[in-house]
Amino acid sequence: MSINPLASKIASPYARALYDFSVEQNIMHQVTADFQNLDVFLAEVPTLMEYLGNPIVTATQKEALLTKTLKSQLNAETFKFLMVLVKRDRINLLPTIITTYLELVYKTASVKMIEVSTAFPFTTLQKLNLIKKLKELTNAREIRLVVTVDSSLIGGFLIKTNSKVIDFTIKNQLENLAKHLDGVLEI
């Protein structure tokens, strides 16, 4: 979920314009659902973004592919927006635009996006308990977890939200213990 600052700066006006338009046209729920589904789809099929981001592929070819694969799956306005991105040669920013747009929606709806890195996948019960605790800590009505599994953490989990990082990993505890022992043994 880390975003290139330059890409974010370029993508932000597009996300804001789509957000404003979707609110104005009363289609925010449809566009949001489209973007949530697209986000999952792009994560599952990374070759699509490689193709769309390829400068050798013409805008016409990109439009044809999107028409074939996504037109029937998306709200008409969402699809038109994708075509605008292709025409303006900004389709490569789609993942960043999606993230920025969803952040705007979640901020409005008091939904917090929280990144969690864990050594092992969470069970459903663990996820629900973590969401419950995070709701209490953040006063958000809803929490959206973005979970990544990172076996280098050894055990535990790491929570990132906005500028806060809460580290409950065994790797961090071992590093802290090593620092403490280094300090004690330097007599």
Swiss-Prot record:
One of its GO terms (biological process) is proton motive force-driven ATP synthesis. The keyword Transport applies. One of its GO terms (cellular component) is proton-transporting ATP synthase complex. It is a peripheral membrane protein. Its main location: plastid. Keywords: ATP synthesis, CF(1), Chloroplast, Hydrogen ion transport, Ion transport, Membrane, Plastid, Thylakoid, Transport. GO terms for molecular function: proton-transporting ATP synthase activity, rotational mechanism. It is found in: Plastid, Chloroplast thylakoid membrane. F-type ATPases have 2 components, F(1) - the catalytic core - and F(0) - the membrane proton channel. F(1) has five subunits: alpha(3), beta(3), gamma(1), delta(1), epsilon(1). CF(0) has four main subunits: a(1), b(1), b'(1) and c(10-14). The alpha and beta chains form an alternating ring which encloses part of the gamma chain. F(1) is attached to F(0) by a central stalk formed by the gamma and epsilon chains, while a peripheral stalk is formed by the delta, b and b' chains. F(1)F(0) ATP synthase produces ATP from ADP in the presence of a proton or sodium gradient. F-type ATPases consist of two structural domains, F(1) containing the extramembraneous catalytic core and F(0) containing the membrane proton channel, linked together by a central stalk and a peripheral stalk. During catalysis, ATP synthesis in the catalytic domain of F(1) is coupled via a rotary mechanism of the central stalk subunits to proton translocation. Belongs to the ATPase delta chain family. This is ATP synthase subunit delta, chloroplastic. It comes from Thalassiosira pseudonana. The lineage of its organism: Eukaryota, Sar, Stramenopiles, Ochrophyta, Bacillariophyta.
